[in-house]
Curated annotation (Swiss-Prot):
GO terms for biological process: glycogen biosynthetic process. This is Glucose-1-phosphate adenylyltransferase. Its EC number is 2.7.7.27. GO terms for molecular function: ATP binding; glucose-1-phosphate adenylyltransferase activity. Involved in the biosynthesis of ADP-glucose, a building block required for the elongation reactions to produce glycogen. Catalyzes the reaction between ATP and alpha-D-glucose 1-phosphate (G1P) to produce pyrophosphate and ADP-Glc. PANTHER family: GLUCOSE-1-PHOSPHATE ADENYLYLTRANSFERASE, GLUCOSE-1-PHOSPHATE ADENYLYLTRANSFERASE-RELATED. NCBIfam families: glgC, PRK05293.1. It catalyses: alpha-D-glucose 1-phosphate + ATP + H(+) = ADP-alpha-D-glucose + diphosphate. The keyword Cell membrane does not apply. The keyword Acyltransferase does not apply. Alpha-D-glucose 1-phosphate binds at residues 100, 165, 180-181, 191. It comes from Clostridium botulinum (strain Eklund 17B / Type B).
Amino acid sequence: MGNTEIVAMILAGGQGSRLGVLTKKLAKPAVPFGGKYRIIDFPLSNCANSGIYTVGVLTQYKPLELNAHIGIGLPWDLDRKDGGVSILPPYQEEKGGNWYKGTANAIYQNIEFVDRYDPEYVLILSGDHIYKMNYTKMLEFHKEKNADATIGVIEVPVNEASRFGIMNTRDDMSIYEFEEKPKIPKSNLASMGIYIFNWKTLKKYLRNDEANKGSSNDFGKDIIPSMLNDGGKMVAYPFEGYWKDVGTIESLWQANMDLLKSDNKLNLHDQDWRIYSTNPVRPAQYIGENAKVTNSLIVEGCTVNGTVQNSVLFQGVQVGKNTIIKDSVIMTNAKIGDNVIIEKAIIGNDAVIRKDCVIGTGDEIEIVAAKEEVKMGSIMKNNKAV
């Protein structure tokens, strides 16, 4: 079928258990973000903007909404006869099917898919990070270094480095050691979970890893250390833009709040590197005569009759009279009644907040699940009814 130079494989099967009720019915990459996107839109858009048009999306946990969102890949120009986007659930063989056992096993189960295109390189991506990145530049770096593997890295604060997989490098960015969440890190170059491998080399390591019954079948824990031990040439590609792992409630809330900063590094208004998504046609937003909106993202289809400060309102959100929303993320089609106070909260899709409620104002980020109804006069603080 091919001789495609590079194939992208997006690992999108994560449950996202640390996101609590937000991922109760959908995979983490399908979680809404930034008013009109889902997390998966970022790696898909990065692929399209980088000219990579053969993409596999490896799904597993609660894939229905994610599959429906991606569809045939039209918003990302991935609806193609040759290549395009393919949804890849765990592989079913004659002896029966298995869940993906780890990130490496997920790619191993799809060797046949990649081989159809006979690529020289394969790009491995996580489906649950928010960032904009030109993968073509990373591929050029990989070629220049004549590497077996190139790993995207980003500098993190030294006091946070022990939370990440850390790459220890020489001056030429060649990697001599990988440490998974070290107690005393030697470096602050954190792995972004973005890898470019020479496909023939990776395929050999995937097969060896699968044959090792003691392996956890993970890129960070098994494949990368194994390649390093064998003397493979591995280099770190430094990335200096905005990047956030939105795997927790706090980081998801913060990433949305980052969009409201005047020096926002993600810049979703950049026409040279657009983030594409599947968006229904909605009427223009309506801001009532007594409404007050400051430093907020208000997406089309919203009706605002109250006060909105430093918040992100997704499509179709309704805000009642005398209601105050502050430092919050209100997801698609949520209905907020009159005389409500919401502060530092994430309100899920289609949630209904009846009038006279108080949600938030405590130390924790308040969460209301998708389609949940909060009854009239309820008070919720630190995720407990008061």
